Curated annotation (Swiss-Prot):
HAMAP family: UPF0757. It comes from the Bacteria. Pfam families: Gly-zipper_OmpA, Gly-zipper_YMGG. Belongs to the UPF0757 family. This is UPF0757 protein YmgG.
C-alpha cells in the first residue's frame, strides 16, 4: 500500500507540474502516459519510473521536425548499444530485447535534447 501511495503521489506531482505548461510536447505526454501505465502495472515507484522513461522515449521519437529526426537517430544508436549490452550480460535474447527497449528510449530522449 505504501508503494502505491508513493507512486500515486509521484504521478500527481508529474501531472500537476505539466499542467503549468499550456502546450505539452509529445515527449511530456508520453512520459505522463507511460508513468500512468507503470502505476497500473502494480510495480510501484519502479514501474512508474520505467514507464515514464519508455513513454518519454516513444514520445520523443514521434515528435515532428528536427527534434523528431534527432530522436529517431538517437533511438537507433541507443537500441543497438542496449541490445549488445544485453547479450554481453549473458541474458541471451531476452536481455537483448530488454536492452534494446531501454537503450532505444534513452537514446531517443538524449538525441532529442542534442
Amino acid at each position: 500500500m505504501k508503494k502505491h501511495t508513493l507512486a500515486l503521489g509521484l504521478i500527481s506531482a508529474l501531472f500537476f507540474s505539466f499542467q503549468a505548461h499550456a502546450d505539452l510536447s509529445r515527449t511530456s505526454k508520453g512520459a505522463l502516459l507511460g508513468a500512468g501505465v507503470g502505476l497500473l502495472s502494480g510495480n510501484g515507484v519502479n514501474g512508474v519510473l520505467k514507464g515514464a522513461a519508455v513513454g518519454a522515449g516513444v514520445g520523443a521519437v514521434t515528435e515532428k521536425g528536427k527534434d523528431g529526426k534527432k530522436a529517431r537517430k538517437g533511438a537507433k544508436v541507443g537500441a543497438t548499444l542496449g541490445a549488445v549490452a544485453g547479450v554481453l550480460t549473458g541474458n541471451g535474447l531476452e536481455g537483448a530485447i530488454k536492452g534494446a527497449v531501454i537503450g532505444g528510449a534513452g537514446g531517443a530522449i538524449v538525441g532529442k535534447m542534442n
